[in-house]
């Protein structure tokens, strides 16, 4: 695995391209995190769109720069809309990202996520329990929470990345980003990131948006993880708890200067 400094150098370079492109990111995400996800993308410089109706989702996925599928509040009708959007993205060669929330805990979403894998996501982002379940190596997880350390799921992530030919992100105290051949580790962040709802889901949206960038997908996705870790650290330094952390986190993303962060670490 390559060191953190390598990722930070990449992250500074990638952030400039991200803000210049402002990827139009079609987010089919869960009801709990819609606003936070949209605000996270906006703060970084992307352009979010929350189009969820089946009639609109299919054509919109074809014109977006990237698509996120997050199954956190999956229903049968929403699954139909998501499948239509993914099929459209696949045909249009729009990169799409899967966030398999609680995939090991509930059979309906497990079958749905496994079915979508045939349509070749550009990236998959999940916690250790979710990646282990999606790879078929284990089932479980406490709802949306992980019962495993990120490193424990790294072999499963690497195997899944090779099988699907995509980037897999396992998040935790240290994030691991792999294409099955190369793996990058991204430490950082702050425990307060786990005390609010939506940081993982928002990261998946940023990962999706980063997949729209030119260049190596592994480096772009690792950069996305680095941005979120750096913003989490910065926000925690000026927060008193979860309530003040959320606006501080959005401000930190908006003002993020990776080059300056590199110089002070």
From Swiss-Prot:
Give the binding site residues for substrate.
50, 198
The cofactor named in the record is: Mg(2+)
- Show the catalytic activity: 5-(2-hydroxyethyl)-4-methylthiazole + ATP = 4-methyl-5-(2-phosphooxyethyl)-thiazole + ADP + H(+)
GO BP annotation list: thiamine biosynthetic process; thiamine diphosphate biosynthetic process
Write down the EC number: 2.7.1.50
GO terms for molecular function, please?
A: ATP binding; hydroxyethylthiazole kinase activity; magnesium ion binding
UniProt-annotated binding residues for ATP: 125, 171
Q: Cite the InterPro entries for this sequence.
A: Hyethyz_kinase, Ribokinase-like
Give the Pfam families listed for this entry.
HK (PF02110)
Top EC class for this record: transferase
Pathways involved: Cofactor biosynthesis; thiamine diphosphate biosynthesis; 4-methyl-5-(2-phosphoethyl)-thiazole from 5-(2-hydroxyethyl)-4-methylthiazole: step 1/1
Alphabetical UniProt keywords = ATP-binding, Kinase, Magnesium, Metal-binding, Nucleotide-binding, Thiamine biosynthesis, Transferase
Functional description taken from the UniProt entry: Catalyzes the phosphorylation of the hydroxyl group of 4-methyl-5-beta-hydroxyethylthiazole (THZ).
Q: Which family does it belong to?
A: Belongs to the Thz kinase family.
Quote the protein name from its UniProt record: Hydroxyethylthiazole kinase
Source organism: Salmonella newport (strain SL254)
Instruction: Give me the gene this protein comes from.
Output: thiM
């Amino acid at each position: 695995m390559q060191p953190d400094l390598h990722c930070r150098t990449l992250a500074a370079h990638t952030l400039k391209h991200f803000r210049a492109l402002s990827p139009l990111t079609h987010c089919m995400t869960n009801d709990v995190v819609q606003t936070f996800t949209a605000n996270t993308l906006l703060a970084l410089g992307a352009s979010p769109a929350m189009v969820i109706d089946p009639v609109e989702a299919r054509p919109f996925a074809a014109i977006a720069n990237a698509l996120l599928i997050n199954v956190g509040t999956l229903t049968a009708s929403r699954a139909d809309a998501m499948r239509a959007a993914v099929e459209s993205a696949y045909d249009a060669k729009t990169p799409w990202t899967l966030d398999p929330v609680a995939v090991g805990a509930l059979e309906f979403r497990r079958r749905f996520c496994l079915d979508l894998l045939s349509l070749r996501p550009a990236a998959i982002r999940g916690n250790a329990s979710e990646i282990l379940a999606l790879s078929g190596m284990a089932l479980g997880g406490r709802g949306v929470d992980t019962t495993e350390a990120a490193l424990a799921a790294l072999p499963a992530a690497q195997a899944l990345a090779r099988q699907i030919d995509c980037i897999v992100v396992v998040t935790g105290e240290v994030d691991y980003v792999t294409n099955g051949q190369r793996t990058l580790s991204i430490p950082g962040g702050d425990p307060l990131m786990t005390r609010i709802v939506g940081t993982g889901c928002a990261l998946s949206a940023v990962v999706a948006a980063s997949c729209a960038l030119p260049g190596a997908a592994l480096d772009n996705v690792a950069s996305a993880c680095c941005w979120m870790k750096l913003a989490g650290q910065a926000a925690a330094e000026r927060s008193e708890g979860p309530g003040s952390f959320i606006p501080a986190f959005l401000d930190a993303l908006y003002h993020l200067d990776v080059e300056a962060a590199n110089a002070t670490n």
